[in-house]
């Protein structure tokens, strides 16, 4: 979960770098994120088939190798100064993130026994996910300094850190034993199954909900960063990275709440409440004038909090982190409930 958030989170501050290094539009600066998540559409079903055929462990190891290569390509884009190579790296990284999500989510839900307990375990792991997401924008914002002069190569330490994490986790995972409850046995593979996860209506609705959720979860901090660093607002990239880091920090707080009460509160109630409050926050952010400013506590690079003056809309976008935090686990838990052998 930490690796997923760390690598996915790189696309957010990289959007600022790409915008300035290649004089890209806001749309082009977000294509890295788009490429990262479009990869899910290509890899989702193959990843599930891999999980059934070779199991959790081998699928995860393969995902780590692909992720290492994806981050390596991102590093090469800085060396070559190529926008196309940057997009390729983001796309390849997306393959890895999709495969890792395919492994960790059903595994945690299964280990928790499904239901509220399964949701609780996913929320605990999600807290670790949020730690990685909190670190990335703060770290890269600190590394690039002046956004107008930022280059992809300035963020090399973050890329090296990501590759190092991949390498360490690969070694640790290679030496571990992991249960394989969803691996299809050879005799079962020969018998065609007329049904699949797509036979369940709630699974299809869950897949649509996850698709929409990911766009919201990642889109909020991305456009918050673009808005904060725009000439009209003029917030320093390092400070903007800290503001975005606060969004992810609030996601961690929300997931710790979900982990604490996930066994007592149903996924449906938790999801409905979070979505309603999140919509209210977004509406306030949309209609609040940019000239109205407030002092907002932000998570800084020295692992402390400081006060920064921001438009009130940015503060409410950051507060959305509390709402989006528990939505992934709730959606996934409800979507796979009762799938049995089709969970993978």
Residue ranges and their predicted role:
Residues 11-12, 198-245:
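Extracytoplasmic gate region of multi-pass secondary transporters
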Residues 42-84:
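Conserved MFS/SLC helix-loop-helix module at the cytosolic interface between two early adjacent transmembrane helices
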Residues 31-49, 245-257:
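Central cavity-lining transmembrane alpha-helices of secondary-active solute carriers
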Residues 99-113, 325-340:
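Intracellular juxtamembrane helix-capping segments at the cytosolic ends
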Residues 83-100, 297-328:
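Hydrophobic core of transmembrane alpha-helices in multi-pass small-molecule transporters
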Residues 1-24, 101-105, 220-228:
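Extracytoplasmic
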Residues 65-80, 277-306:
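C-terminal ends and interior cores of transmembrane alpha-helices
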Residues 118-177:
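Helix-loop-helix hairpin linking two adjacent transmembrane segments in secondary transporters
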């Amino acid at each position: 979960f930490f690796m997923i958030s760390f690598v996915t989170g790189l696309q957010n501050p990289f959007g600022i770098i790409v915008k300035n290094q290649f004089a890209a539009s806001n749309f082009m600066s977000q294509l890295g994120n788009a490429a990262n998540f479009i990869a899910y559409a290509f890899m989702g079903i193959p990843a599930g088939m891999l999980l059934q055929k070779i199991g959790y462990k081998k699928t995860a190891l393969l995902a780590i190798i692909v992720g290492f290569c994806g981050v390596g390509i991102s590093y090469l884009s800085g060396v070559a100064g190529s926008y196309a190579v940057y997009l390729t790296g983001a796309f390849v990284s997306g393959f890895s993130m999709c495969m890792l999500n395919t492994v960790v989510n059903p595994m945690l839900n299964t280990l928790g026994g499904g239901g509220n307990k399964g949701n609780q375990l996913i929320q605990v792991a999600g807290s670790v996910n949020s730690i990685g997401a909190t670190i990335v924008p703060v770290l890269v914002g600190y590394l690039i300094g002046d956004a107008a002069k930022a280059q992809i190569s300035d963020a090399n330490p973050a890329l090296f850190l990501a590759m190092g994490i991949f390498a360490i986790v690969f070694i640790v995972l290679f030496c571990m034993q992991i249960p394989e409850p969803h691996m299809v046995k050879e005799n079962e593979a020969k018998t065609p199954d007329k049904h699949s996860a797509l036979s369940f209506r709630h699974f299809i609705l869950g897949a649509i909900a996850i698709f929409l959720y990911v766009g919201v979860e990642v889109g909020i901090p991305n456009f918050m960063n673009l808005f904060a660093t725009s000439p009209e607002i003029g917030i320093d990239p390092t400070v903007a990275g800290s503001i975005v880091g606060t969004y992810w920090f609030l996601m961690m707080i929300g997931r710790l709440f979900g982990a604490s009460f996930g066994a007592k509160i149903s996924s449906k109630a938790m999801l409905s409440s979070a979505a309603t409050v999140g919509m209210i926050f977004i509406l306030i952010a949309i209609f609040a004038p940019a000239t109205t400013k407030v002092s907002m506590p932000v998570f800084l690079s020295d692992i402390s909090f400081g006060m920064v003056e921001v438009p009130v809309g940015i503060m409410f976008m950051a507060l959305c982190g509390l709402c989006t935090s528990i939505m992934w686990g709730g959606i996934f838990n409800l979507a796979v409930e009762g799938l049995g052998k089709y969970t993978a």
